[in-house]
Amino acid sequence: MSAPEKPRERSFPKIEFTDSEAGAKEFPSSKSRSYSYFTPAKLRATMYEDVTVDVQPDPDRHLTQGWIYGFGNGPGGYPKDWTTAKSSDWHAFRDPNEEWNQTIYRNNAAVVRQVELCLKNAKRARVYDGWNSTWLTFIERNVGAWMHAENGLALHVFTSIQRSGPTNMINTAVAVNAAHKMRFAQDLALFNLDLAEATEAFDGSAHRAVWQEAREWQATRKVVEELTAVGDWCQLLFATNIVFEQLVGSLFRTELIMQIAARNGDYITPTIVGTGEHDYDRDLNYTRNLFRLLTRDPEHGEANKALFTEWLGIWVPRCLDAALALQPIWSAPADKAVTFASSLDAAKAKFTALLEEIDLDIPEELNK
């Protein structure tokens, strides 16, 4: 009888430490569970910074192996040459509103509830029955036409560039901007539908022909369409939030609608338009911070100022033409509480103050 075979011993590969594993390198705070790889803007990192900073990869920060994906015949990732503006550190930008995924839904949901409650109360109180035909015509033509401008900016300006920036902080702010515009355009559409159902004197389809054919709106329509053709994401953001919104958007919303609606017995339209104004005020906060960062950049600041001055030379004349073309609208309401000249002067004054805040010279075209 043969002796039983001894069971073979299983062999395991020898463990070798290559110093590439997590925890291999010790440095200050390396044992802390709250260690951060970025320098927060304040003493402690906020929730906004925790969920946005360095979420989008960058070969200049931590991505030492370069882009790990990309198009076959194109650049990988998020190229910085998608804009002619330069920055020594794009990652220094922080959104003062601290917007991220959660706040988009929370803030927009609050506005939606406000608008729904406003429209529901208006229908229950039969508010629209007291509006005169002149004011109803003004709303159906002009507020309805502005809805197209907001929708165009939402879908073809901000949505198209909300993944073009070199950092997640910039792209998140632009994405929130797109959500604001989209929701505001939908609010105006809902308002239009409610009015069409509430009174036969209101033509709910008139806005389409006004936007496409009315002489006073064609210059505005032209600027919006020209904006959608711009490929440089930074120029698009500058031309829209700095120039167009100041000289055309705020002129129409703030200096006309918000000033004259109550005098014409309308307290509903200012409530809805006011939500769009609040959105733009928040969007202007991040825009101001971004362009102030670029004009004060220690390495590229002067070149950026020269570039932004060129952009002002392109877009200020176009937006002024659009603003001047809207002048007949100021004469349409029965109660004319403000003049076009005073409204335009107020818009120009705010635009001038904004340019001073981002260290840019006032363009000559503004005073012609």
Swiss-Prot record:
Positions of the UniProt region annotated as Disordered: 1-32
Source taxon at top rank: Bacteria
EC primary class: oxidoreductase
Keyword set, alphabetical order: Monooxygenase, NAD, Oxidoreductase
Bias type Basic and acidic residues, positions: 1-17
Keyword Signal: no
Gene3D superfamilies: Ribonucleotide Reductase, subunit A
Record-linked InterPro entries: Ferritin-like_SF, MP_mOase_hydro, Phenol_Hydrox, RNR-like
Catalytic activity: propane + NADH + O2 + H(+) = propan-2-ol + NAD(+) + H2O; acetone + NADH + O2 + H(+) = hydroxyacetone + NAD(+) + H2O; butan-2-one + NADH + O2 + H(+) = 1-hydroxy-2-butanone + NAD(+) + H2O; phenol + NADH + O2 + H(+) = hydroquinone + NAD(+) + H2O
GO molecular function: oxidoreductase activity, acting on paired donors, with incorporation or reduction of molecular oxygen, NAD(P)H as one donor, and incorporation of one atom of oxygen
Record-listed E.C. numbers: 1.14.13.227
Transmembrane in keyword set: no
Inducers of expression: By acetone. Transcriptionally activated by MimR.
Function: Component of the propane 2-monooxygenase multicomponent enzyme system which is involved in the degradation of propane via the O2-dependent hydroxylation of propane. Also involved in the degradation of acetone via the O2-dependent hydroxylation of acetone. Also able to catalyze the oxidation of phenol, methylethylketone (2-butanone), 1-propanol and 2-propanol.
Family: Belongs to the TmoE/XamoE family.
Subunit: The propane 2-monooxygenase multicomponent enzyme system is composed of an electron transfer component and a monooxygenase component interacting with the effector protein MimD. The electron transfer component is composed of a reductase (MimB), and the monooxygenase component is formed by a large subunit (MimA) and a small subunit (MimC). Requires the presence of the chaperonin-like protein MimG to ensure a productive folding, resulting of a soluble MimC, which leads to the active form of MimABCD.
Name assigned to this protein: Propane 2-monooxygenase, hydroxylase component small subunit
Phylogenetic lineage: Bacteria, Bacillati, Actinomycetota, Actinomycetes, Mycobacteriales
Protein's gene: mimC
